[in-house]
């Protein structure tokens, strides 16, 4: 019978040790995300999958905020983050740093997530959009590609934190395969 692991058996790193661990060359960009709970959840997932940083843009809430902390469980302390007034400022900087800009958006030329495998060492910026409007068209226009999660139900939409978790896991799993 399976037995749950104790906290000791999980071998959790402290914040300072976590900051020293090699991260994936993946940056998450949040394009005008409204919900503090979604932001906190994305911080927590980024911590789990060794994402190098999160860039918060526009109206996206920034730590310290109670709701971010509640859902992040402190991951806003371990994951490096930056803020930009506009997403385009962040995209311009990332392009100068040789990142491939990958908007997570349903588009006419989107690549299905199951067909997306980053090259080893490739620097990727994953852009996730607003809960209602998605990634802004201006950002989509500047992207190197759009990635879409295949969906077969009636809604054809996922909560941004769920979407981000699926895509971050895909990048993490690809690194370890």
Model-derived features with residue positions:
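Post-transcriptional modification and biogenesis factors for structured RNAs
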Residues: 1-177
């Amino acid at each position: 019978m399976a037995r749950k692991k104790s906290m000791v058996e999980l071998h959790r790193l402290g914040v300072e040790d976590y900051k020293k661990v090699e991260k994936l060359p993946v940056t998450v960009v949040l394009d005008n995300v409204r919900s503090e709970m979604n932001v906190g959840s994305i911080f927590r997932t980024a911590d789990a999958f060794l994402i190098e940083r999160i860039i918060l843009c526009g109206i996206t809430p920034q730590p310290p905020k109670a709701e971010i902390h509640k859902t992040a469980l402190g991951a806003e302390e371990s994951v490096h983050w930056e803020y930009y007034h506009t997403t385009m400022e962040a995209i311009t900087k990332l392009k100068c740093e040789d990142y491939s800009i990958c908007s997570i958006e349903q588009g006419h030329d989107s690549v299905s997530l199951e067909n997306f495998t980053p090259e080893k060492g490739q620097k990727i910026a994953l852009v996730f959009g607003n809960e209602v409007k998605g990634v802004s068209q201006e950002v989509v226009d500047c992207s190197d590609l759009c990635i879409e999660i295949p969906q077969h139900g009636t809604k054809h939409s996922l909560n941004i934190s769920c979407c981000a978790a699926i895509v971050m896991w895909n990048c993490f799993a690809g690194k370890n395969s």
